[in-house]
């Protein structure tokens, strides 16, 4: 590793002497702040501003991002409420020019009704397998490269979703509708003014998952399944937490397309030490009988305040450069500062 990488790594570790490691999982978002609450109606605003420097082969790239979200709730009665949520993510990668590659991603847009027996929403929301990949997706930057989710199991639009918590059992289910298309007599997609009929794109599907917590033992297990068109997959995961230590594993298997088998597994470990959290993951996946992911990553996260942190993360890419090429087999160093609001 060249001197530039070493210098940046040392400086990133040195500047962060901060205060609070809020748990071992460093990848999630924090709760927002309530800006309005009256007569059973509340509005929370949250998000993050995150500066992220990525270095591969000594070359730098700006992967910085800002997320902003709004959560509104309205109490209908003692056991029923309405909910609406939006989150957008703005990224910038100008390549030395003025606003040439900026983008806005509408990550979530949904509304629904919740109560004693769970919450039902419609819109762009998470499928059911995200809570399973969360078992091992614990790092500030790297990780989660072997448990690939098909579209219907991930964050996608046109989705009817349910989640509920019943004691130690949490369940999620989602169904994505196929998208309507206007087509001509030959089946070609056209504008509605020139259409002969409606069709759909065949992208409907569903996902299911369940997580069970064994009381206060620190042991959790999870399982999930998803199916969409020619794609399907299942996931199994388990974790164990003991005071400041955390261990987890995940296995997934399925088809990413017709006759394209996919198998992957992830291992994760974390340790919380006062002001800091240290995490490590190993990811391995095989697609169509070829190794598509093979890496080991470590990171350290330091908290100045509960909502402000710095981190450094390094991924050792173990793919064979003779098989996948130099670019696809490069290691990566990432340095970041993150402010949550």
UniProtKB/Swiss-Prot annotation:
InterPro entries (alphabetical): Gram-neg_bact_OMP, Gram_neg_porin_domain, Porin_dom_sf
Gene3D superfamilies for this protein: Porin
GO molecular function, one term: porin activity
GO cellular component: cell outer membrane; pore complex
Signal peptide bounds: 1-21
Keywords from the named record: Cell outer membrane, Ion transport, Membrane, Porin, Signal, Transmembrane, Transmembrane beta strand, Transport
Main subcellular location: membrane
Cellular localisation: Cell outer membrane
Membrane topology qualifier: Multi-pass membrane protein
Any one biological process term the GO annotation gives: monoatomic ion transport
Pfam families: Porin_4
Domain of life: Bacteria
Family membership: Belongs to the Gram-negative porin family.
Complex and partners: Homotrimer.
Function: Forms pores that allow passive diffusion of small molecules across the outer membrane.
Name of the protein this chain belongs to: Outer membrane protein U
Biological source species: Vibrio cholerae serotype O1 (strain ATCC 39315 / El Tor Inaba N16961)
């Amino acid at each position: 590793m060249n001197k530039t990488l070493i210098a940046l790594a040392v400086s990133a570790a040195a500047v962060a002497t901060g205060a609070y490691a809020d748990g071992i999982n460093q990848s999630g978002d924090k709760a927002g702040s309530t800006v309005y609450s009256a007569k059973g109606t509340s509005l929370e605003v949250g998000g993050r501003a995150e500066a992220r420097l990525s270095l591969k082969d000594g070359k730098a790239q700006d992967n910085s991002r800002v997320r902003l979200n709004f959560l509104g709730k309205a109490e209908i009665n003692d056991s029923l409420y309405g909910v609406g949520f939006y989150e957008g993510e703005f990224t910038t990668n100008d390549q030395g020019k003025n606003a040439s590659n900026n983008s806005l991603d509408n990550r979530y847009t949904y509304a629904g009704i919740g109560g004693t027996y769970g919450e039902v929403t419609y819109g762009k929301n998470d499928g059911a397998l995200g809570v399973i990949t969360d078992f091992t997706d614990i790092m500030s930057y790297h990780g989660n490269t072997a448990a690939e989710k098909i579209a219907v199991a991930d964050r996608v639009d046109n989705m009817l979703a349910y989640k509920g918590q019943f004691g130690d059992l949490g369940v999620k289910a989602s169904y994505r509708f196929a998208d309507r298309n206007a087509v001509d007599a030959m089946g070609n997609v056209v504008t509605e003014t020139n259409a002969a009929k409606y069709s759909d794109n065949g992208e409907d599907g569903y996902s299911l998952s369940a997580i069970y917590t064994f009381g206060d033992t620190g042991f959790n297990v999870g399982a999930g399944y998803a199916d969409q068109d020619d794609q399907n997959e299942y996931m199994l995961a388990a974790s164990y937490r003991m005071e400041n230590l955390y261990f987890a594993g995940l296995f997934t298997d399925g088809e990413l397309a017709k006759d394209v088998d996919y198998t992957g597994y992830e291992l994760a470990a974390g340790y919380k030490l006062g002001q800091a959290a240290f995490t490590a993951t190993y990811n391995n996946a095989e697609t169509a009988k070829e190794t598509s992911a093979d890496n080991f990553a470590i990171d350290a996260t330091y908290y100045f305040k509960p909502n402000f942190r710095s981190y450094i993360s390094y991924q050792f890419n173990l793919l064979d450069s003779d098989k996948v090429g130099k670019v696809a087999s490069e290691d990566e160093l990432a340095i970041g500062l993150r402010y949550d609001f």
